[in-house]
Amino acid sequence: MAIIFNPNKKIFTLQTAHTTYQMQVDRLGYLLHLYYGAKSTCDMDYVLTYADRGFSGNPYAAGMNRTYSLDTLPQEYPTLGTGDFRNIALDIKNEQGTESVELLYKSHEIRDGKYALKGLPAVWASDDEAQTLEIVLGDDIAGVEVHLLYGVLEACDVITRSVFIKNTGSGNITIEKAHAACLDIVYGDYDVIRFYGKHAMERNLERTRLGHGTLSFGSRRGTSSHQYNPAVILAQRDTTENAGDCYGMLFVYSGNFSCEAEKDQINQTRLLMGLSDELFSYPLAAGETFTVPEVIMSYSADGFSQLSHQYHTCISEHVCRSRFAHEVRPVLINSWEAAYFDFTGDTIVDLAKEAASLGIDMVVMDDGWFGKRDDDNSSLGDWFVNEKKLGGTLSELIDRVHAQGVKFGIWIEPEMVNEDSNLYREHPDWAIQIPGKLPVRSRNQLLLDFSRKEVRDNIFNQICAVFDQGKIDYVKWDMNRSMADVYAGNLAYDYVLGVYDFMERLVTRYPDILLEGCSGGGGRFDAGMLYYSPQIWCSDNTDAINRTRIQYGTSFFYPVSSMGAHVSAVPNHQTGRVTSLKTRGITAMAGTFGYELNPALLSDEEKEEIREQIKTFKKYEMLINEGTYWRLTSPFEDEVAAWMSVSRAKDRALVSVVRLYAEANAAACYVKLKGLESDAVYIEENTGRQYTGAALMNAGIPLPFAVKEYEAYQFSFIRLDEAKKLYDEIKKVCGNLKSGEADSTDSASDKRIVISIYGGSGSGKTTIAAALQQYFLNDNTACYVLTGDNYPHRIPMRNDEERLNVYNESGEDGLRGYLGTPKEIDFDRINKELSEFKEGKDIIEIKHMGREDGDISYDETDFTGIKVLILEWTHGGSEYLKGVDIPVFLESSPEETKARRIKRGRDENAASPFICRVVELEQEKLDLQGKNARIVVGKDGKVYEQ
């Protein structure tokens, strides 16, 4: 069980996979916080200390005990008016203006499954994935009952918290402050990490030492805002990406919020998160209830990366509900930066044609398709299609776009109204404004009062009438201003609930529409929005270099799959910066990936580069979106921005690096990777170079020296699973080969083993042999790789000439009798070397052959201590070859061999008809020799013994 109650001590213990959260109902009925941190099975009530501290009052129920004070004890949900003079979580005012609620324990319930919040987004889970603890506290005199809700998702290492408040009295009360979570820590010296910003530059990381007093931030803008994200990390001073204690809080809410971190008089720390108490005063009549939105809490003892992974898993698995959350999503192109308001239906169709030719999946028609909207001064609220501008109906346009083989998306801004609109002229009172005062304009628009159902219904019906005109595949929901004219204390909260109601109705009616959130970019990038839309436009700033910072900060809580990121034109429309198409593409691949540009203005070379970009993204899309995301550097501190995605199985990894500035005579730059298997062997796809996971993580990879500013690189690593499987199979076949571990027959330590790896040209022999060697070395077994390419009678160029001569003189039968026989191969030489190795000779002359005439040498090689010789060679299964203990056959086909040879690019005639026929004849022999192999590596990667 994830939740345990000790009735003797009245201790609640909440256990996740790696953390423990504990609290206790004390003898006076107060709910005290005991512990949150690394997993523990101990009752932690011993951490409570009691001391008589001047001016820290004592509850009357404590009698004459001056050491008991709520001003110093760690509390689970502190309230105003109880003698706790620190920041509090709850403040309720009664009709007389008294602000005092003393919450005492009444009851609790533990149940399977995760609680839900009516009208609010919240983490969801099945009954076997989560448990709920509901603790009821109350103040009978004040007539208030508070239900503390805890959701425990054991596998995710997260605990959610929400609060349900009920007026149980006969009079009215007003909630003046309501936070969802409080965390009291009795020890430690902490930093606060918050994510500040502005429009077009959101979620910049700022780490501040928490001194005495309060550090607070939040939003009073009606949205979670560009300026501060509703997320916070409390970290010990020495915490880094990879080590140290840190706590996270993430508010699942899209409106006004507040976060308060306080270090008190005796160096205790209190962290609070919930609704902002500014512009908030919520009335409750007798019997009415109020729900505080949810906070997701998590703890990591292993630094920020692990904390991020826990949040990423929680959001992608238990917040996002869209069917698109784990699906391949379309690569889109948006009309905004391509045309802004200046477009027609033909413009959109032309964009679709260009998109199709580039491999783009979807065209999105952005702002300007409705009412009479040719600029941002009119028509918001009039959600009817401007058929004159589009040159026909929306249905016709959608069909024309779909006819190009691409999907169709559309932009909306349901919460807004222009004064120059039919809606405003008919219902001016539907716009939010303070009675008797003129409203505050922003972007020449006003905010509709979505706290009112009749307003929501009108807009919803208008939007549905548009969506029902054709198959719309995607919708971008925008929101381009803050709330200023707050006419009542309940407005800001009720407005957000109205938005959620609208979104719930929309996604329920149109489950097959991919919904992307937006608020001037990342002004409402929060977990509340992700409950309805699986992705959010990360920022209106598409500059690749700025985006490395924006996406870096975003990644601390939100998964890559949630970040809308596009390649835009240069000079960039926000910064004027020029970066290469490659750099822009690599940066945008750390998100949902798409384009914000006019393809008609691109050169043929740029278009071809975009085609290749899209192929690359689609190749790695699920690795990027579903893999584990690692931050490798900080773009705020380092000369490069680097990040990587690692598959859950750790068998694939994609590393991306962007240089942030250039420097003359620069030092070499290395990037250390993360999240790989230390002992595994990985091959880098582009170079064919092999590394162990330990080498990549501890030494890193050197970057090419910069030729120009803002260069970017990608490295793709694949774990050589066939080599590991082969190694395990070989160990079973030949027993323990470790040096110095002889058995009674001395066959283990003294006997030398010869393994041949053979298969068609380009079948991966060299790769498998090198990886196999590394696995032997990992196991402390000395191993040598010998290549069979050194043993033809002639250098490769002359050998191909001789093959052609044989064919011309004797035909195909003659060629068949030449290939792989002593006529072509110096079997005597290689058999001599293998024989000397097996006899135990330590110094052996090994033949080496180059690619030029006369480039043949015999080099003395020291085999002292070497127990295994791996021969990698096309003819490693030949009947003429002697001394092989374990022949290993790599299955392949002539078609695969041809493709690999061409890709390898080593032989200029690899695709010639003659060479292709040679490969086919060699394959005939290989197929026969393969039947004599001891071990076979199949085309499907399976390894088995024959």
What do the predicted segments below correspond to?
Residues 784, 793-852:
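Conserved nucleotide-sensing/catalytic segment adjacent to the nucleotide-binding pocket
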Residues 693-722:
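C-terminal beta-strand-rich structural cap/linker in extracellular carbohydrate-active enzymes
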Residues 5, 10-13, 17, 21, ...:
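Polysaccharide-binding surfaces and accessory modules of carbohydrate-active proteins
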Residues 856-904:
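ATP-dependent NMP and nucleoside kinases share a basic, alpha-helical "lid"
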Residues 324-461, 474:
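Aromatic-lined carbohydrate-binding/catalytic grooves of carbohydrate-active enzymes
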